[in-house]
């Protein structure tokens, strides 16, 4: 027969709380690593994506979560170790905040998947005719270099196909494409692919598939990883919220027991209580006497 009291006593509750926080800390470290990896792996193409579908959005969420978890775990550990209810209330508030953030992020990512893909496609089509962008720190980036890197790495051309480059602002009167659209397997190492995009009659030498399907799938597979991380964190945070409320009740009960034991051990308090109790008994006796006398007087009348 399993003794539930030995498994779920006050000491075990606090131990479970600490163990859950260790798991929470590990998941926070994992989230931080994923965020840094997402930023470094997608940073080369970040200028081609809209803000709503930006790699930095997912990376920023993971980094924010990781750093916040470190702070939350520290607050929770100190709150329980010092039996400080204010710190524990702060811990509960932070956990609820993360639950809301991850819940909203998970639902939004599931509901607006197709809309985000269409926004990505429109942004890529717009950027084909944009020569450069200026970052928030004032640095100018030539989009032609970003497109060249994207097309060579993903072996694609344009958004839907190579015709997206025709009559672009780079060559408004010609059916040219960037040299990065040329498939290297059709060229020898000696001649290379220089000016191959200016051969409109040799379109078979170009990558035939557009970059949008590959780029969106590439981003989406990485975002799936983020969704898994947020889902795991969401479950852990719900568990921590329940355990933190249980521990808060344990601390309150412990404080009440401590105060009661101090009162019982304090002789002055005990004698004062006895004096007050005796005075209460005297007052009760007087009240009973007065009640009896009043009753007798009424009967005599």
UniProtKB/Swiss-Prot annotation:
It is found in: Cell membrane; Basolateral cell membrane; Cytoplasmic vesicle membrane. Residues 1-16, 81-86, 244-301 are cytoplasmic. InterPro entries: Tetraspanin/Peripherin, Tetraspanin_animals, Tetraspanin_EC2_sf. It is a multi-pass membrane protein. Its main location: membrane. Disruption phenotype: RNAi-mediated knockdown in a sma-9 (cc604) mutant background restores the production of the 2 M lineage-derived coelomocytes. SUPFAM superfamilies: Tetraspanin. Residues 38-59, 108-222 are extracellular. Keywords: Cell membrane, Cytoplasmic vesicle, Glycoprotein, Membrane, Transmembrane, Transmembrane helix. Glycans are attached at residues 129, 161, 191. CDD domains: CD151_like_LEL (cd03155). One of its GO terms (biological process) is positive regulation of BMP signaling pathway. Signal peptide: none annotated. It comes from the Eukaryota. GO terms for molecular function: identical protein binding. One of its GO terms (cellular component) is basolateral plasma membrane. The chain crosses the membrane at residues 17-37, 60-80, 87-107, 223-243. Regulates cell fate specification in the postembryonic mesodermal M lineage and body size, probably by positively modulating BMP-like Sma/Mab signaling at the ligand-receptor level. Promotes ventral fate specification in the M lineage, probably by positively modulating lin-12/Notch signaling. Belongs to the tetraspanin (TM4SF) family. This is Tetraspanin-21. The lineage of its organism: Eukaryota, Metazoa, Ecdysozoa, Nematoda, Chromadorea.
């Amino acid at each position: 027969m399993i003794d539930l009291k030995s498994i779920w006593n006050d000491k075990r509750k606090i131990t479970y709380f600490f163990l859950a926080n260790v798991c929470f800390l590990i998941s926070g470290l994992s989230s931080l690593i994923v965020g840094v990896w997402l930023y470094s792996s997608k940073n080369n193409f970040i200028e081609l994506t809209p803000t709503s579908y930006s790699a930095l959005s997912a990376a920023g969420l993971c980094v924010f979560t990781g750093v916040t978890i470190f702070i939350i775990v520290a607050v929770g550990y100190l709150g329980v170790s010092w039996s400080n209810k204010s710190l524990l209330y702060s811990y509960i508030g932070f956990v609820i905040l993360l639950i809301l953030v991850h819940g909203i992020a998970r639902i939004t990512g599931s509901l607006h998947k197709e809309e985000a893909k269409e926004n990505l496609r429109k942004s890529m089509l717009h950027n084909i005719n944009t020569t450069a962008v200026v970052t928030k720190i004032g640095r100018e980036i030539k989009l032609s270099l970003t497109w060249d890197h994207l097309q060579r790495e993903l072996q694609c051309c344009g958004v839907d196909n190579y015709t997206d480059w025709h009559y672009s602002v780079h060559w408004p009167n010609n059916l040219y494409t960037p040299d990065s659209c040329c498939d290297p397997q059709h060229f020898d190492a000696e001649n290379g692919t220089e000016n191959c995009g200016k051969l409109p009659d040799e379109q078979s030498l170009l990558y035939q598939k557009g970059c949008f399907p590959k780029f969106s799938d590439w981003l989406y597979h990485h975002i799936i990883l983020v969704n898994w991380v947020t889902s795991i964190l969401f479950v852990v945070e719900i568990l921590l919220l329940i355990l933190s409320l249980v521990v808060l009740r344990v601390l309150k009960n412990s404080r009440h027991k401590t105060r009661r034991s101090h009162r019982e051990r304090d002789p002055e308090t005990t004698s004062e209580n006895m004096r007050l109790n005796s005075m209460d008994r005297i007052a009760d006796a007087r009240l009973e006497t007065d009640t009896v006398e009043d009753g007798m007087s009424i009967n005599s009348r």
